Structure formats: structure tokens, C-alpha cells
Amino acid sequence: MKRKLQNIAYLLVAAALVTSCGGKKQTSEFPDWAWADFQRPEGINPIISPDTTTFFYCPMRQDSVAWEASDTFNPAATVYDGKVVVFYRAEDNSAIGIGSRTSRLGYASSDDGLHFKRMSVPVFYPADDSQKELENPGGCEDPRVAVTEDGLYVMHYTQWNRKQARLAVATSRDLQTWEKHGPAFAKAYNGRFIDEFSKSASIVTKLIDGKQVIAKIDGKYWMYWGEKFVNVATSTDLVNWEPMLDENGEFLKVMTPRAGKFDSDLTECGPPAILTDKGILLFYNGKNKSGAEGDTLYTANSYCAGQALFDAKNPTKLIDRLDKPFYIPESDFEKSGQYPAGTVFIEGMVYFKNKWYLYYGCADSKVGVAVYDPKRPAKADPLP
């Protein structure tokens, strides 16, 4: 009996010693709709880090720049020609501070989803084109990519001219030659929202014969988008999008931050949403507030990853939502760099070789990957 009491006491002390994001793990059960057990491959991360040896002739500066010297993070991902392709946000060394450098998108491909070969120059960047006033000097940030059944790749990204952030659209057939279409909401409501702050889009997708493709619901394409809150928009052509509005004519908020939770400050959309047999599964990034309004189990201002379930027949209807994140900053490089509060910022996810590969930004500085095997039963969410 004495030994049994000692064991119980040990467990209680161990639980009390658990700290914020990145501490030892407790466990709790997931609902059956959630995709729980994303695992970090041992010895793999980070998969992409800054490189000071690569240079690119910038058409806007008309000079050679070390385009990925400072930070490489916040990746989109897709599958092309049997390989995983990641588009990562790369910042040059032109200044100091988040959002003060120029961002361009690098291209990396992989045969196994874990080891990547990078191109030496960016494939997407501010240029002397129709979008230069909206993209220069801040750049092209935080992409998400999805593909149609007939092979049209659709990228949503943030245009940043250091005055206003705008969600924009580009399309490609080969992932290297892109057509920029400009702000996603440029034509909606007679251009009312073209100068409104917007970013972070998750197009609804589905699996068809093992391929993740853009889905239609009631004859329209749908996407969740937003940073401070989650909104919904629809499109008939994947280029021009119409955000849904509430009874007051403002953006319809289908999901908002929750006081006392890990997502108490922001609920920012992540990779493409997935249409499942339970509903529409939305992966998102939750930012934790400091103080009493946040979740004291997690570091103040940290970004952790959450999941929410929406109704497949009514994509504006939130059915359920995880109370705890399914993925949190743990590794040193996820809690250092530009964002030492801790960040796992999920933006890319692909179905590849019967598993789901999740790609994320590590503290706004590097790129990591986690893998989910749907054949493996869900264990538990990581609690601090």
C-alpha cells in the first residue's frame, strides 16, 4: 500500500510540473471527427532553413539580393508529378523585424515528403507587373495551394505593400509559371472590400481516388478565410470570390476567438479544409492572449494548431471545435527565432502515399513537417 501511495504521489507531482507549450505531455481523448495523432518524424525537422548562399536578381530593386538569408517559414504544399511540392515564404536580409523585409516564395520538392530539394531562386515574388503597387516592397506572404481535378493549381497568398494586407489569387498548371489575378475580393459588392484587411484562405477540398482536389458544394467553390476571425467566401471560377455578410452587411464571422482558450486572441485559417464523412474539417492557427483572457496552460502569445468541424451541407454552421490544440510548439526551433513565444503555424497539408503530411512555420523562422496516418487510431491531444 505504501508503494502504491508513493506511485500516486509521484504521478501527481509529475503532472504539477508540466509547463506550457513544449512541456511534457498529458493526454485526453479526441472526438471521432478530429485527426489527432500528427507525429514529428524523428531527426527530420526542420526541413527548410535560411540559406545565405543563394542570390536572386530582384526586378524591383534592380539588384542582386540574398532572398532567403533571414527566415524561411509558413509553407503551402501540394502534390505535382508524384512529388510533394512546398512553397515557403522566404525573407531577405534587407531589414530587421517581422513584416519589415521583402517576402518571396521559394520552391522545394520531395520524393518522400520529408527530404526536400530546393530551387536556388524564388518562383513567386514582387515584379514589375499589374500587382506591383500591392506587393512591393513587403512582398508575397503566407501561401496556400490547392488543385482542381483537371490540374489547375490555385494559390491564395497575402499581398503586402506595408500599408495594407490583401488576400490575392494566382493560378498555374506547372507550379513555376503563375498568373496573378489580384485581390480575391476585388469585384465583390462593387469593389467594396478591395482595400479591407484580408488574408489566410483555406479552400474546401476532398479526396477522390486518393487525390486531394478542390470540392464544390451546391455548385460553388467555398473557402474559409481570415485572421482575427473566420469568414466564408464562395466563387464560381476560383478567381473572383464573394465573402458572405451578416445582417449588418459586414463580414460573417463563423468562428471567433474564445476567452480562456488557446485561441483567445486569433483564429487564423490554415491549410485547405477537408470534406470528410463527418463534415468539413478546418485546420486553423490559434494565438493565445496573455493574462487572464488567455489559456494559462499555454505560453502567452504562442501559436498552436486547432481543428473545427463545419456542416457539409451548410459550411457556415460550426458543429464542434477542439478545446485544446492538437499540435503545439515543442522543439527549440519552434520556440526561438523571430517568434520566441512559440509558433507552429500550419499552412500546407497533402495526402501522399496514404498519409497526411502537415507543413508548418516554426517561430516565423524555419519549416517543419508532421505526419498523420489515418489507419492508426487517434491517441490523444498534447496537453501542456
Annotate each predicted stretch with a short phrase.
Residues 263-269, 342-345:
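Donor nucleotide-activated moiety binding/catalytic core segment of transferases
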Residues 334-336, 344-347:
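Short glycine-rich, acidic/polar surface loops and turns
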